A protein has these predicted regions:
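Generic N-terminal amphipathic, Lys/Arg-enriched alpha-helix
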Residues: 17-25
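Acidic, low-complexity central loop/insert segments
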Residues: 63-118
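Short, low-complexity Ser/Thr-rich regulatory SLiMs
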Residues: 13, 52-53, 108-110
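Short beta-strand-to-turn element immediately C-terminal to the catalytic PLP-Schiff-base lysine
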Residues: 24-28, 51-52
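N-terminal, positively charged, Ser/Thr/Ala/Gly-biased leader segments
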Residues: 1-18
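Short, well-ordered strand-loop elements centered on a beta-strand within folded domains, enriched
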Residues: 21, 34, 56-62, 111-118
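Anion-binding (especially nucleotide phosphate/pyrophosphate-binding) glycine-rich loop
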Residues: 35-69
Length: 118
């Protein structure tokens, strides 16, 4: 069985254990939707984001413990922050997330994440 690693990232705060937590799973390859749902059920946070790089964009899905959801602000902010913090994307570059709700763009501006719905 493939391993899926995840990070817990707190959005809307600069302090540990504050803000709104989200789990972010950085995927190397596609996993079944049923597996995403099972992972989200196991992680004790409101939302789990699944992020997979494809070409110049990232494909992105959000799950609660009950179901997939069409969009999640704090999950998007947490995921973008993690991609910059881990050096996967340079901080001076924007990130385009392809989602079931359409593309989202994230930019790092003045030490904050700005999300734009395209």
């Amino acid at each position: 069985m493939n391993r899926v690693s995840y990070f817990i990232v707190n959005a809307f705060t600069t302090e540990l254990y504050k803000g709104n937590p989200a789990a972010v799973c950085l995927l190397d390859s596609t996993i079944p939707e049923s597996t995403m749902q099972k992972i989200a059920q196991e992680i004790p946070v409101p939302t789990t984001a699944f992020v997979q790089k494809k070409d110049n964009d990232f494909f992105f899905r959000w799950f609660t413990s009950v179901a997939e959801i069409p969009i999640c602000g704090h999950g998007t902010i947490a995921s973008a922050f993690l991609l910059w913090q881990q050096g996967i994307v340079p901080v001076d570059s924007s990130i385009t997330f392809q989602t079931l709700s359409g593309p989202l763009q994230a930019r790092w501006i003045n030490q904050q994440v700005e999300i734009t719905i395209k």
